[in-house]
Amino acid sequence: MSEIGTRVYTECDADLSLIQNVLVAVIGYGSQGHAQALNLRDSGVNVVIGLKENSASRKSAQDSGFEVLLPQEAAKKAQLIALLVPDPAQRDVYESAIKHNLSEGDALLFSHGFNIRYGYITPPDGVDVLMVAPKGPGHMVRREYLDNRGTPAVFAIEKDASGRCFDLALSYAKGIGALRAGAIQTTFTEETETDLFGEQAVLCGGLEQLIQYGYETLVEAGYQPEVAYFEVLHELKLIIDLIVEGGLSKSRWSISDTAEYGSYVSGPRVIDKHVKENMKKILGEIRSGEFANRFIKDQDSGANEFTQLREIAARHPIEEVGARLRALFSWSK
């Protein structure tokens, strides 16, 4: 259990002027970078973008009206640096562009704790280290902000050198619209470990494998691939929407009695206790740093394993069937 508790912080808990009174350098203009930069600017925050000279995102940021500098120039100019490039790239960007341009009293912000948790980045003393992590992809963060809503977030303080890091984190969260929905305090360790576990065991790895096995089981038994696709993949969104809206209980309330009964008697046989034991092993690899080491080692050597695994996944028959069906039906257009 977390020692922090489960208080939800909202807009009334934050002073927006704190982030409005500093210059923010957003390093990176990808999914989170573009969304957070645009939301901050629309909240009255002064923002510059830090991108390499040959970055494919440079024109997009300039077209959005931002001043675009080299990462080292942006870091030197700003008082808060939001490092929002992908995890594997953060070490090099930090070492080459940020590390020597941090001044005492500056703040370094992340939206995922990976590099701090596993020690790939160690900021100097005298610098605030904080995290604001929206619980949704960048396009959702931007869309919800424009619709006068917000994407929930978690935030964390790793190093409070200034004595105001907590308030600064809430101010930043308010600036990107997260406090409209609410934010929960966590730690870099908790955010990193639970985020990686959720991705690997449930949301991405576990779910994708479950879908593929379900599809293969039906097709191997002689059913049409198109029908199998509908039953194990397409209808998933309908169930997920219900779960997000009202938890597992709303999903059970909304489905037929046949489906509900079947879920009780068959679900635990598909996802049995061995699955939970495997989940515990995966969590152990995350907590020990074994996964991080494997991932970074592969990235540093050219991402050969990652590329091979991606190619294998792309060749699964469900991909071709899905692409063909989505091209035929109006719901995908």
UniProtKB/Swiss-Prot annotation:
Describe which pathway this protein belongs to, using the record's wording.
Amino-acid biosynthesis; L-isoleucine biosynthesis; L-isoleucine from 2-oxobutanoate: step 2/4; Amino-acid biosynthesis; L-valine biosynthesis; L-valine from pyruvate: step 2/4
According to the UniProt entry, the coiled-coil residues are none
Q: Which residues form the active site?
A: H112
Key words of the record: Amino-acid biosynthesis, Branched-chain amino acid biosynthesis, Magnesium, Metal-binding, NADP, Oxidoreductase
Note the HAMAP family from the entry.
IlvC
What family is reported? Belongs to the ketol-acid reductoisomerase family.
| Function summary | Involved in the biosynthesis of branched-chain amino acids (BCAA). Catalyzes an alkyl-migration followed by a ketol-acid reduction of (S)-2-acetolactate (S2AL) to yield (R)-2,3-dihydroxy-isovalerate. In the isomerase reaction, S2AL is rearranged via a Mg-dependent methyl migration to produce 3-hydroxy-3-methyl-2-ketobutyrate (HMKB). In the reductase reaction, this 2-ketoacid undergoes a metal-dependent reduction by NADPH to yield (R)-2,3-dihydroxy-isovalerate.
Q: What is this protein called?
A: Ketol-acid reductoisomerase (NADP(+))
Native organism: Tropheryma whipplei (strain TW08/27)
